[in-house]
């Protein structure tokens, strides 16, 4: 079964790759998922995924941004589900590209934060967030789970920079927390999750999210009303049962004919209509209609008389 998060990523990978934004999106992929290794006496940069659409996206980003076609290696995992694994391997201009994307500094040291040119450009920020979500993001199905979207980071300062991007440019009210093996930024508000999906370009997924959210909220509202009605019915039934019990006690001990006329009329009516609510009794009692508070006052008098009879025994 395809998950909602998979649908979101499928839509994002189908978006056109714009040359002016490709580097920002690629920078997120390489910074978050890239692995530098040595093959055949030369450095290579590998990105591994089980999603073929994401592999194609990375391939297109590298080709668009730098005019280089990386290797695309497909293998089959031998454990568990035996899924296919896709490896995108960059072997040319590795150091130059990592330096250009500000993942390496001038001494070839790793820069774990997000470059200033992305932190100060709204359009680049949108592209970077798209790449970050594709690389290490997830979102719950709004129909069946609590509202939650998150992006994982290995490094704390990268996580903090993601938080700044999401809040300073787009006012998403994102939060950050530490996980056992890293850090996450996350969204819990349904409206903000919808905004994020729109920002990164998943417009269809955003519309589907809003539809599912509205349906879920409507169901919750209906359930609350049903629960409220059920509680009110139960309360009405319990109150009526106690009133009938009091009236039957009075009838047995002294007879209803010895009650004041208004109380006797109400007592007889309640015995024949135990299912009616207080409001319905007030409207239908033979000497009425009277106010709901008036009916309640009469039942209170009956209650006091029944209580007195119990105490006498």
From Swiss-Prot:
SUPFAM superfamilies: Homing endonucleases (SSF55608). Residues 277-311 bind DNA. GO terms for molecular function: DNA binding. It holds the Pfam family LAGLIDADG_WhiA. GO terms for biological process: cell division; regulation of sporulation. Keywords: Cell cycle, Cell division, DNA-binding. It comes from the Bacteria. Involved in cell division and chromosome segregation. Belongs to the WhiA family. PANTHER family: CELL DIVISION PROTEIN WHIA-RELATED. This is Probable cell division protein WhiA. It comes from Lactobacillus gasseri (strain ATCC 33323 / DSM 20243 / BCRC 14619 / CIP 102991 / JCM 1131 / KCTC 3163 / NCIMB 11718 / NCTC 13722 / AM63). The lineage of its organism: Bacteria, Bacillati, Bacillota, Bacilli, Lactobacillales. The gene is whiA.
């Amino acid at each position: 079964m395809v998950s909602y998060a998979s649908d979101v990523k499928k839509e994002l990978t189908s978006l056109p790759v714009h040359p002016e934004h490709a580097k920002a999106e690629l920078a997120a992929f390489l910074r978050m998922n890239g692995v530098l290794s040595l093959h055949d006496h030369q450095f290579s940069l590998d990105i591994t995924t089980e999603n073929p659409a994401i592999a194609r996206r990375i391939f297109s980003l590298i080709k668009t941004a730098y005019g280089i076609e990386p290797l695309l290696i497909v293998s089959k995992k031998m454990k568990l589900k035996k899924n296919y694994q896709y490896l995108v391997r960059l072997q040319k201009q590795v150091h130059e590209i990592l330096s250009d994307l500000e993942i390496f500094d001038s001494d070839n040291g790793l820069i774990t934060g997000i470059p200033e040119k992305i932190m100060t450009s709204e359009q680049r920020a949108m592209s970077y967030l798209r790449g970050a979500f594709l690389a290490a993001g997830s979102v719950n199905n709004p129909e069946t789970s609590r509202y939650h979207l998150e992006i994982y980071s290995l490094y704390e300062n990268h996580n903090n920079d993601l938080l700044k991007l999401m809040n300073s440019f787009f006012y998403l009210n994102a939060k950050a927390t530490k996980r056992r093996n890293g850090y996450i930024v996350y969204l819990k508000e349904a409206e903000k999750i919808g905004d994020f999906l729109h920002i990164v370009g998943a417009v269809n997924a955003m519309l589907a999210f809003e539809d599912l959210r509205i349906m879920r909220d409507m169901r919750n509202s209906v359930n609350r009303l049903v629960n409220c009605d059920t509680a009110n019915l139960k309360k009405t039934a319990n109150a009526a049962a106690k009133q009938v019990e009091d009236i039957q006690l009075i009838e047995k001990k002294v007879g209803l004919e010895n009650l004041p006329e208004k109380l006797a009329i109400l007592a007889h009516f309640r015995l024949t209509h135990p299912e009616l609510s207080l409001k319905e009794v007030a409207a239908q009692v033979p000497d009425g209609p009277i106010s709901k508070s008036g009916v309640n006052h009469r039942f209170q008098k009956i209650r006091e008389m029944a209580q007195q009879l119990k105490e006498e025994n």
